[in-house]
Design a protein with these regions (language model features):
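N-terminal Rossmann-like FAD-binding beta1-loop-alpha1 element of flavoenzymes
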Residues: 3-28
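Short, flexible, mixed-charge acidic loops at enzyme active sites
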Residues: 39-45, 133
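Dinucleotide-binding Rossmann-like beta1-alpha1 core, especially the glycine-rich loop
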Residues: 45-129
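Conserved small/polar residues in nucleotide/adenosyl-binding loops
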Residues: 158-164
Length: 168
């Protein structure tokens, strides 16, 4: 008998199944597309970032990054001693016009409180960092260093986590 049944095997369901299985729980995931050919997560961009408005999401983003960096150790098996999710760390640049700048300035306070490593760039200085971007109408922008944010290959990640759960 299963200890836990999870409905939906996307990134949240798969992550939940993984962490519960690491605690010794028997987990079954019910996924309408158990082949993952049309499931949303493998078809997504696989981004991970810290730049959110709420502290909870910032902290979750930090946790996800640490997990992703540990994939080679956490998900290795006899059959796959060097697993990878083809991680690319490239950072994220988010830009805001005057109508959303105040909202972002408030979010930056949360970024600082959570040690997210976010840098604020005035719109007038954006071209000093990114000369190929048209900064017209940009009030402010935020960026993290290249090691904090990026993306993984969702298909590779899905295949790495499938052995930790029974998908039906």
């Amino acid at each position: 008998m299963d200890d836990v049944v999870i409905v939906g095997g996307g990134i949240i369901g798969a992550a939940t199944a993984y962490f519960l299985s690491k605690e010794g729980r028997k987990v079954k995931v019910i996924e309408k597309d158990p082949t993952y050919k049309t499931a949303s997560f493998p078809l997504s961009l696989g981004g991970f970032r810290r730049q959110f408005f709420q502290k909870e999401n910032i902290l979750l983003g930090k946790f996800a990054r640490e997990f992703i960096f540990q994939i080679p150790d956490l998900l290795k098996t006899e059959k796959n001693p060097k697993p990878t999710a083809s991680m690319v760390t490239n950072g994220y640049l988010l830009m805001f016009g005057p109508e959303h700048a105040d909202e972002q300035y408030k979010a930056l306070e949360n970024h600082k409180a959570c040690d997210a490593g976010t840098k604020n760039i005035k719109g007038s200085e954006l071209n000093n960092f990114f000369p190929y971007i048209n900064s017209e109408g940009i009030e402010t922008a935020t960026f993290t260093d290249n090691q904090s944010e990026g993306w993984i290959d969702p298909v590779s990640y899905t295949h790495l986590t499938l052995p930790t759960m029974q998908v039906v």
